[in-house]
From Swiss-Prot:
SUPFAM superfamilies from the UniProt entry: NagB/RpiA/CoA transferase-like (SSF100950)
Positions in coiled-coil regions: none
Name of the protein this chain belongs to: Glucosamine-6-phosphate deaminase
Gene Ontology CC annotations of this record: cytoplasm
Highest classification ranks of the organism: Bacteria, Bacillati, Actinomycetota, Actinomycetes, Mycobacteriales
Length: 259
């Protein structure tokens, strides 16, 4: 696991965009996340597409999750969200952006089919991730199995409450079930790119990076991955104990060693 500490989340977004640009230029498969954390990175990639000609035409992409029962046309579906925030602004073909089907007649079966589709398409080359304040990744809440596959999960009441801000503050409008890639599925991506910003993420970052690998902190599974990059701003890194080494390692990184 490589830890990159940046002064601000804008600096982090630029580094993340540098990493993703390499994959885009090679036509690789991207794993996309929604939420506020990757927005700066998406905006920087959109800028490079518009101003520098960065193309995503040869790429394909998979999203992490979707609400169960929410039509994809709904503005808060993750199908709509990823297009509104990123993919509709670049040249990746829409038919090459794959999403879980939250309105499938048989959601459990659809989850298994999505898991198989990822494998059939060659797997994910780089997966963007964010971390919840409780250490969750995607919708894998604490105590999720580290071997879990794409499946249906019941949202924690706190998650429903948090997400109600996207539904005019009305918790009754927030779906209580989601289809999410499992931790085992996510682990199969060849490169995990974790972005963490803000002091409210400091405890989760500490648990993920320097705590034990445990189901109570799903993100701690990154410690077992052969190629994980964690980019944090100063606020999110505030509780890490080994920042001196993380900074030293980055400053002395050989030119030939990519992120």
């Amino acid at each position: 696991m490589e830890i990159v500490i940046t002064p601000t989340k804008d600096d982090a977004a630029r580094i993340a965009a540098d990493i993703l640009e390499e994959y885009a230029r090679e036509g690789k498969t991207l794993g996309l996340a929604t939420g506020s954390t990757p927005l700066g990175t998406y905006q920087e990639l959109i800028r490079r597409h518009n101003e520098e000609g960065l193309s995503f035409a040869e790429c394909q992409a998979f999203t992490l999750d979707e609400y169960v029962g929410l039509p994809r046309e709904h503005e808060q579906s993750y199908y709509s969200t990823i297009r509104r925030e990123f993919t509709s602004h670049i040249d990746i073909p829409d038919e090459k952006v794959f999403n879980p089907d939250g309105t499938a007649e048989h959601p459990g079966q659809a989850a298994q089919e999505y898991d198989r589709l990822i494998v059939e398409k060659g797997g994910v080359d780089i997966q963007i991730l964010g971390i919840g304040t409780d250490g969750h990744i995607a919708f894998n809440e604490p105590t999720s199995s580290m071997a879990s596959r794409t499946r249906i999960k019941t949202l924690h009441p706190d998650t429903v409450r948090d997400n109600s801000r996207f539904f005019n503050g009305n918790e009754s409008q927030v779906p209580h079930h989601v289809m999410t890639q499992g931790i085992g599925t996510i682990r199969e991506a060849r490169h995990l790119l974790m972005l963490c910003f803000g002091e409210n993420k400091a405890d989760a970052v500490k648990a993920m990076v320097e705590g034990p690998v445990a189901a109570v902190c799903p993100a701690s599974v990154l410690q077992l991955h052969e190629h994980a990059t964690v980019i944090v701003d100063e606020a999110a890194a505030a509780k890490l104990e080994h920042t001196q080494y993380y900074r030293y390692a980055l400053e002395n990184k050989p030119d030939w060693q990519r992120f």
